Amino acid sequence: MKNRPTAFSFLFLSFLLSATVLHAQDWQLKRDKGGIKVYVRDQAGTNIKEMKFSTTVEAPLQTIAAVLTHVEGYDDWVYASLKSRTIKQVSDTEAYYYTLIDFPWPFENRDLVLHSKIWQDKKTLALHSKTTSAHWMEGEKESVVRIKKAELYWLFTPIGNGKVRVDYTLNSDPGGNIPAWMINLAADQGPLQTMLKFQEMLEKEKYKNSKLAFVTNEK
């Protein structure tokens, strides 16, 4: 019995050390295009890279939140999105939705069922949006590969003078028989185009005039 706490402590310490090493993995700059910096880093247990996209925009937080929460508008700016629809609107800040993604030949199209939450830090006014897979909520479709691993995180940090720093982190696996090296080679193209189109959406009148109760603009 006396040995059990020691063994448990060793395992727990090993876990903490492993987590610390993973957390300390630095982002590496892959490219800088159109004012958007693209970073990559290794992930534990897979050869597929995690990606982060960073830029600065000039837009009210209300406008940013309006674009992010309008699921039916995703086809206008999310790269290769063929059809996006809300499955369940839990609240103004939480939803489940479906997205069908166009994949290049010879690969089959992909789809995702996702759970998204958005919230604001009342002290810093930073806006957070986290989206994770909810692939079990809707049946899979014929000739379409369901993406079951997906985690997207947006962070919008006000930096003064009406400007906002944008950090978009993406961790996913498209599934199917696509080699990891091929995924890593082209994986940043879609999200990069998404970021560019997202900035265009911020200029649309239907979003610029939005008033959302759960978001406070920077003064």
Q: Would you name each region that the model predicts?
A:
Residues 1-7:
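Positively charged n-region of N-terminal signal peptides that target proteins for export
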Residues 9-19:
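Bacterial N-terminal signal peptides
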Residues 20-24:
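Sec/Tat signal peptide C-region and signal peptidase I cleavage site
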Residues 25-219:
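Eukaryotic helix-grip
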